[in-house]
Amino acid sequence: MRTPTHDEFSGRLDSLNGDRSNVFGPELGEFSNADRRADELGDKETKTGTTTVGIKTEEGVVLATDMRASMGYMVSSKDVQKVEEIHPTGALTIAGSVSAAQSLISSLRAEVRLYEARRGEDMSMQALSTLVGNFLRSGGFYVVQPILGGVDETGPHIYSIDPAGSILEEEYTVTGSGSQYALGVLEQEFEDGLSIEEAKGVATKAIRSAVERDLASGNGINIAVVTEDGVDIQRHQNFEGLE
Protein backbone atom coordinates (compact mmCIF):
# COMPACT_ATOMS: atom_id res chain seq x y z
CA MET A 1 0.00 0.00 0.00
CA ARG A 2 1.20 3.51 -0.77
CA THR A 3 2.58 5.21 2.32
CA PRO A 4 0.63 8.48 2.72
CA THR A 5 3.55 10.88 2.50
CA HIS A 6 3.28 12.26 -1.06
CA ASP A 7 3.75 16.04 -1.17
CA GLU A 8 1.30 16.50 -4.09
CA PHE A 9 -1.54 15.86 -1.67
CA SER A 10 -0.15 16.03 1.79
CA GLY A 11 1.86 19.23 1.61
CA ARG A 12 4.28 20.39 4.28
CA LEU A 13 3.35 21.42 7.80
CA ASP A 14 6.56 23.18 8.81
CA SER A 15 4.62 26.12 10.20
CA LEU A 16 2.74 23.84 12.60
CA ASN A 17 5.75 21.99 13.92
CA GLY A 18 8.80 24.13 13.47
CA ASP A 19 10.46 21.13 11.86
CA ARG A 20 10.03 18.80 8.90
CA SER A 21 7.39 16.58 10.50
CA ASN A 22 4.30 15.87 8.43
CA VAL A 23 0.92 14.60 9.57
CA PHE A 24 0.85 12.36 6.52
CA GLY A 25 4.32 11.01 7.18
CA PRO A 26 4.07 8.98 10.38
CA GLU A 27 7.26 7.06 9.63
CA LEU A 28 9.19 10.35 9.82
CA GLY A 29 8.35 11.01 13.47
CA GLU A 30 5.68 12.48 15.71
CA PHE A 31 4.46 16.03 16.12
CA SER A 32 6.79 17.75 18.53
CA ASN A 33 3.99 19.71 20.20
CA ALA A 34 1.29 17.03 20.53
CA ASP A 35 1.72 16.43 24.26
CA ARG A 36 2.03 20.14 25.03
CA ARG A 37 -1.15 20.89 23.07
CA ALA A 38 -3.07 18.27 25.05
CA ASP A 39 -1.81 19.67 28.36
CA GLU A 40 -2.71 23.24 27.38
CA LEU A 41 -6.24 22.44 26.24
CA GLY A 42 -7.23 20.06 29.03
CA ASP A 43 -10.98 20.27 29.66
CA LYS A 44 -11.35 23.22 27.24
CA GLU A 45 -11.30 20.88 24.26
CA THR A 46 -14.58 19.44 23.02
CA LYS A 47 -14.56 15.67 23.35
CA THR A 48 -17.03 13.03 22.34
CA GLY A 49 -16.81 11.20 25.67
CA THR A 50 -18.58 8.41 23.94
CA THR A 51 -19.56 4.82 23.66
CA THR A 52 -18.98 3.21 20.27
CA VAL A 53 -19.63 -0.38 19.24
CA GLY A 54 -18.66 -2.48 16.22
CA ILE A 55 -20.06 -5.92 15.36
CA LYS A 56 -19.17 -8.16 12.42
CA THR A 57 -21.75 -10.42 10.77
CA GLU A 58 -21.62 -12.68 7.72
CA GLU A 59 -23.53 -10.05 5.71
CA GLY A 60 -21.63 -6.96 6.76
CA VAL A 61 -20.86 -4.89 9.84
CA VAL A 62 -22.86 -2.80 12.28
CA LEU A 63 -21.40 0.28 13.96
CA ALA A 64 -23.27 2.17 16.68
CA THR A 65 -22.51 5.22 18.81
CA ASP A 66 -24.21 7.59 21.20
CA MET A 67 -24.69 11.27 20.25
CA ARG A 68 -23.28 13.33 23.15
CA ALA A 69 -20.23 15.62 23.17
CA SER A 70 -18.79 17.05 26.36
CA MET A 71 -16.45 19.83 27.45
CA GLY A 72 -15.19 19.05 30.91
CA TYR A 73 -18.30 18.39 33.00
CA MET A 74 -20.62 20.19 30.56
CA VAL A 75 -22.65 18.60 27.76
CA SER A 76 -21.54 20.72 24.79
CA SER A 77 -23.72 19.02 22.17
CA LYS A 78 -26.60 16.55 22.15
CA ASP A 79 -26.54 15.82 18.42
CA VAL A 80 -23.10 14.64 17.31
CA GLN A 81 -22.69 12.18 14.47
CA LYS A 82 -19.88 9.91 15.64
CA VAL A 83 -19.83 7.49 12.72
CA GLU A 84 -18.91 8.63 9.21
CA GLU A 85 -18.48 7.05 5.80
CA ILE A 86 -14.82 7.23 4.74
CA HIS A 87 -14.89 4.67 1.91
CA PRO A 88 -17.69 3.45 -0.41
CA THR A 89 -17.95 0.31 1.76
CA GLY A 90 -16.25 1.50 4.94
CA ALA A 91 -17.13 3.66 7.96
CA LEU A 92 -15.32 4.95 11.03
CA THR A 93 -16.57 5.68 14.55
CA ILE A 94 -14.91 8.36 16.64
CA ALA A 95 -14.11 8.63 20.33
CA GLY A 96 -11.91 11.38 21.75
CA SER A 97 -11.15 14.90 20.54
CA VAL A 98 -13.81 16.20 18.14
CA SER A 99 -11.44 18.48 16.21
CA ALA A 100 -8.86 15.73 15.75
CA ALA A 101 -11.54 13.24 14.68
CA GLN A 102 -12.99 15.64 12.11
CA SER A 103 -9.53 16.26 10.67
CA LEU A 104 -8.79 12.52 10.60
CA ILE A 105 -12.01 11.74 8.73
CA SER A 106 -11.39 14.46 6.12
CA SER A 107 -7.82 13.26 5.60
CA LEU A 108 -8.87 9.62 5.24
CA ARG A 109 -11.57 10.43 2.69
CA ALA A 110 -9.11 12.38 0.59
CA GLU A 111 -6.42 9.70 0.78
CA VAL A 112 -8.89 6.94 -0.17
CA ARG A 113 -9.97 8.91 -3.26
CA LEU A 114 -6.36 9.60 -4.21
CA TYR A 115 -5.30 5.97 -3.70
CA GLU A 116 -8.15 4.61 -5.82
CA ALA A 117 -7.74 7.23 -8.56
CA ARG A 118 -4.03 6.49 -8.92
CA ARG A 119 -4.29 2.70 -8.76
CA GLY A 120 -7.61 2.18 -10.47
CA GLU A 121 -8.73 -0.28 -7.80
CA ASP A 122 -10.64 -0.25 -4.53
CA MET A 123 -8.67 0.14 -1.31
CA SER A 124 -8.96 -3.02 0.80
CA MET A 125 -10.02 -2.83 4.44
CA GLN A 126 -6.60 -4.08 5.51
CA ALA A 127 -4.96 -1.24 3.60
CA LEU A 128 -7.44 1.26 5.02
CA SER A 129 -6.84 0.06 8.59
CA THR A 130 -3.10 0.46 8.06
CA LEU A 131 -3.66 3.99 6.80
CA VAL A 132 -5.73 4.87 9.88
CA GLY A 133 -3.07 3.37 12.16
CA ASN A 134 -0.31 5.32 10.41
CA PHE A 135 -2.20 8.59 10.83
CA LEU A 136 -2.77 7.97 14.53
CA ARG A 137 0.83 6.92 15.09
CA SER A 138 1.96 10.23 13.58
CA GLY A 139 0.77 12.04 16.71
CA GLY A 140 -1.17 14.59 14.66
CA PHE A 141 -4.62 13.41 15.76
CA TYR A 142 -4.41 13.56 19.56
CA VAL A 143 -6.39 11.72 20.99
CA VAL A 144 -8.74 9.67 18.81
CA GLN A 145 -9.71 6.02 19.24
CA PRO A 146 -11.77 4.82 16.27
CA ILE A 147 -13.44 1.62 15.18
CA LEU A 148 -13.16 0.86 11.47
CA GLY A 149 -15.81 -1.32 9.88
CA GLY A 150 -16.06 -2.28 6.24
CA VAL A 151 -16.56 -4.86 3.54
CA ASP A 152 -14.18 -5.75 0.71
CA GLU A 153 -13.65 -8.69 -1.62
CA THR A 154 -12.49 -10.84 1.31
CA GLY A 155 -15.63 -10.14 3.36
CA PRO A 156 -16.67 -8.00 6.36
CA HIS A 157 -14.06 -6.63 8.79
CA ILE A 158 -14.05 -4.84 12.15
CA TYR A 159 -10.82 -3.20 13.37
CA SER A 160 -10.14 -1.70 16.78
CA ILE A 161 -7.44 0.96 16.46
CA ASP A 162 -5.97 2.60 19.55
CA PRO A 163 -4.61 6.19 19.79
CA ALA A 164 -1.03 4.91 19.37
CA GLY A 165 -1.92 3.26 16.05
CA SER A 166 -2.07 -0.43 16.96
CA ILE A 167 -4.60 -2.41 14.91
CA LEU A 168 -6.60 -5.44 16.03
CA GLU A 169 -9.16 -7.21 13.87
CA GLU A 170 -12.11 -8.32 16.00
CA GLU A 171 -15.51 -10.03 15.81
CA TYR A 172 -16.86 -7.22 17.99
CA THR A 173 -15.29 -4.31 19.84
CA VAL A 174 -16.03 -1.17 21.86
CA THR A 175 -14.32 2.16 22.54
CA GLY A 176 -14.97 5.22 24.65
CA SER A 177 -15.75 6.16 28.21
CA GLY A 178 -18.77 3.84 28.41
CA SER A 179 -17.03 0.86 26.89
CA GLN A 180 -17.01 -1.26 30.05
CA TYR A 181 -20.81 -1.17 30.21
CA ALA A 182 -21.26 -1.90 26.51
CA LEU A 183 -18.69 -4.70 26.54
CA GLY A 184 -20.61 -6.59 29.19
CA VAL A 185 -23.67 -6.64 26.93
CA LEU A 186 -21.66 -7.76 23.91
CA GLU A 187 -19.99 -10.56 25.87
CA GLN A 188 -23.42 -11.84 26.84
CA GLU A 189 -25.36 -11.23 23.61
CA PHE A 190 -22.90 -11.76 20.75
CA GLU A 191 -22.88 -15.10 18.98
CA ASP A 192 -21.69 -16.39 15.63
CA GLY A 193 -24.19 -16.21 12.80
CA LEU A 194 -25.96 -12.99 13.82
CA SER A 195 -27.94 -11.34 11.04
CA ILE A 196 -27.62 -7.61 10.39
CA GLU A 197 -30.93 -6.95 12.15
CA GLU A 198 -29.91 -9.05 15.14
CA ALA A 199 -26.55 -7.27 15.33
CA LYS A 200 -28.34 -3.90 15.26
CA GLY A 201 -30.41 -5.03 18.24
CA VAL A 202 -27.34 -6.15 20.18
CA ALA A 203 -25.47 -2.92 19.38
CA THR A 204 -28.47 -0.85 20.45
CA LYS A 205 -28.72 -2.73 23.74
CA ALA A 206 -24.99 -2.17 24.34
CA ILE A 207 -25.21 1.58 23.70
CA ARG A 208 -28.32 1.88 25.85
CA SER A 209 -26.57 0.12 28.73
CA ALA A 210 -23.69 2.58 28.48
CA VAL A 211 -25.76 5.77 28.31
CA GLU A 212 -27.66 4.73 31.44
CA ARG A 213 -24.42 4.57 33.45
CA ASP A 214 -21.79 6.75 31.73
CA LEU A 215 -22.16 10.54 32.16
CA ALA A 216 -20.22 11.27 28.97
CA SER A 217 -22.53 9.14 26.78
CA GLY A 218 -26.14 9.84 25.88
CA ASN A 219 -28.73 11.71 23.80
CA GLY A 220 -29.63 9.07 21.22
CA ILE A 221 -27.89 6.64 18.92
CA ASN A 222 -26.27 6.56 15.48
CA ILE A 223 -26.38 3.20 13.69
CA ALA A 224 -24.36 2.46 10.55
CA VAL A 225 -24.84 -0.69 8.50
CA VAL A 226 -22.03 -1.45 6.05
CA THR A 227 -22.48 -4.08 3.35
CA GLU A 228 -21.02 -4.70 -0.09
CA ASP A 229 -23.74 -2.33 -1.38
CA GLY A 230 -22.51 0.63 0.65
CA VAL A 231 -22.89 2.50 3.94
CA ASP A 232 -26.26 3.37 5.50
CA ILE A 233 -26.22 5.63 8.57
CA GLN A 234 -29.35 6.34 10.59
CA ARG A 235 -29.78 8.71 13.52
CA HIS A 236 -32.26 8.13 16.33
CA GLN A 237 -33.01 10.55 19.16
CA ASN A 238 -34.18 7.71 21.41
CA PHE A 239 -34.12 3.92 21.61
CA GLU A 240 -37.80 3.19 21.09
CA GLY A 241 -38.42 0.29 18.73
CA LEU A 242 -34.73 -0.40 18.11
CA GLU A 243 -34.08 -3.38 20.42
From Swiss-Prot:
It is an enzyme of class 3 (hydrolase). Disruption phenotype: Strains lacking psmB gene are inviable. Residues 1-49 form a propeptide. One of its GO terms (molecular function) is threonine-type endopeptidase activity. It is found in: Cytoplasm. The keyword RNA-binding does not apply. Its EC number is 3.4.25.1. Residues 1-50 are annotated as: Disordered. It holds the Pfam family Proteasome. The keyword Ligase does not apply. It catalyses: Cleavage of peptide bonds with very broad specificity. It comes from the Archaea. One of its GO terms (cellular component) is cytoplasm. Belongs to the peptidase T1B family. PANTHER family: ATP-DEPENDENT PROTEASE SUBUNIT HSLV, METALLOPROTEASE TLDD. The 20S proteasome core is composed of 14 alpha and 14 beta subunits that assemble into four stacked heptameric rings, resulting in a barrel-shaped structure. The two inner rings, each composed of seven catalytic beta subunits, are sandwiched by two outer rings, each composed of seven alpha subunits. H.volcanii produces at least 2 types of 20S proteasomes: an alpha1-beta proteasome and a proteasome containing all three subunits (alpha1, alpha2, and beta) that appears to be asymmetrical with homo-oligomeric alpha1 and alpha2 rings positioned on separate ends. H.volcanii proteasome requires high concentrations of salt, similar to the extracellular environment and cytoplasm of this organism, for complex stability and optimal activity. This is Proteasome subunit beta. It comes from Haloferax volcanii (strain ATCC 29605 / DSM 3757 / JCM 8879 / NBRC 14742 / NCIMB 2012 / VKM B-1768 / DS2). The gene is psmB.
